[in-house]
């Protein structure tokens, strides 16, 4: 089947694949055609992000489908966006969560659940005040300082 891949800004390309191909394979083909490294690509189908380890058939992607391509800046990690992407430990958590969700949900439902969890996590981080961050930093940097007067932080 032929898929059309359209970057948000730029020229679209067509790739020949089977429905059993993994998303990562599609990214490799797009990389060859558009000279965009796979780790900078985020493919979307009907507004939903596609996970590299899933097959096109998992998302019911058929012939003549159109995928949107978002190109990430060179330094940004793949997998999650925003603040979570800058921390490799958090990236590992999302990968582990993805594996667990895949065991209990359909690929589409697992993607929805994970997407909502990531949004909730990032919203929680954005809502932290500077005082919250300072308290957290003191507790992390001085875990054994129970005798230390930190009342000024509360």
Swiss-Prot record:
InterPro entries, per this entry? Ubiquitin-like_dom, Ubiquitin-like_domsf, Ubiquitin_CS, Ubiquitin_dom, Ubl4_C_TUGS, UBL4A-like, Ubl_UBL4A-like
The entry lists its GO molecular-function terms as: protein-folding chaperone binding
Instruction: Please give the subunit comment from the record.
Output: Component of the bag6/bat3 complex.
GO biological process: one example: tail-anchored membrane protein insertion into ER membrane
Coarse class of the primary localization is: cytoplasm
Q: What does this protein do?
A: As part of a cytosolic protein quality control complex, the bag6/bat3 complex, maintains misfolded and hydrophobic patches-containing proteins in a soluble state and participates in their proper delivery to the endoplasmic reticulum or alternatively can promote their sorting to the proteasome where they undergo degradation. The bag6/bat3 complex is involved in the post-translational delivery of tail-anchored/type II transmembrane proteins to the endoplasmic reticulum membrane.
Q: What is this protein called?
A: Ubiquitin-like protein 4A
Query: What are the Ubiquitin-like domain coordinates in residue numbering?
Result: 1-76
Location comes to:
Cytoplasm, Cytosol; Nucleus
GO CC list: BAT3 complex; cytosol; nucleus
Keyword field contains Cell division: no
The alphabetized UniProt keywords are: Cytoplasm, Nucleus, Transport
**Gene that produces this protein:** ubl4a
Q: Is this entry keyworded Transport?
A: yes
One Pfam family in the UniProt entry: Tugs
